[in-house]
């Protein structure tokens, strides 16, 4: 009849873990599931593929360096901030998953794990820590990186075990076969991860989340302007919301600059040159104000820059509309910033980012050097060369490339 799915076909194609994970995380157990085979494939690629690649990255460099986790655990105080952050997020995850499973909400548990793997561990922690694994030596920083990533992977193997028993078993055994840290023959004999409140730093999590948000906005602007991340740009401008905001951004400034390939961040207090526009969100206003929606919408559309700034700063704004006092919330409006000459501008909630899109000769040369590094690394991969293999590179001479090589010679050599 075509109104049913053959489970054996799906399991044979995608595996039982991906099928189960999709069914559990796609909708609550007590709700009807609109089954979509493409969704199972996406889970296989996006979640399990990402987690597998993260383990593969760890295993590659751990084998090169002979890491066996024989060293004593480095205390939290001796670990870099990025390690303390991911361990804080990991313990927040442990608590969230434990609570969700205890409340019979496996959907929430699975989604929490997915967010951690994709947004925190793979797309942020591993990306920012790559150089720590690449570099030579066995200093504390490198040991901390290995211990931290190992802990994340081992913990994840236990967290996913109730939903993805086979993948969890393989991940756990592959890790434990090398280190022998646990004596259990199976992940399903191991204890569920314990929550360590002393490793949780909510302020650090908040600062890193702000860095993630700013980076996401800058990368979005780059994409809109067709400017690759490999092309360095001079600066971004951030309007200062308050002292706390400035201090938080300053604490993660170097991280932001590195991730989005920008030279500097400029904090501004005078935002008059930024042209902000506001429009009502009728879906939010309608249920809230009924017949008053139209006059309130007219009031919102007529708000000047001063009132918009007040609404952004305070989160709400009182107004008299048709002899009635109403409270306009940020969720009742859409605020956006128009681009200005030489800059691309975007905003999300109360946060505004302006990106300097002008390119100098020096920036172009550095961008060309980064492009070469990428091409050379791809050639290494295509030729099947190991990370440890030394190579000689020949670049065809021309005035533009000669200058770029001369000014970025050390960078090109060290990165390839």
Q: What is each model feature region?
A:
Residues 1-12, 31, 40-416:
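Feature 926 captures the class I aminoacyl-tRNA synthetase adenylation module centered on the KMSKS loop
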Residues 21-22:
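Non-catalytic, structured segments within soluble enzyme domains
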Residues 25:
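Structured mid-domain segments that build the active-site/substrate or prosthetic-cofactor binding neighborhood
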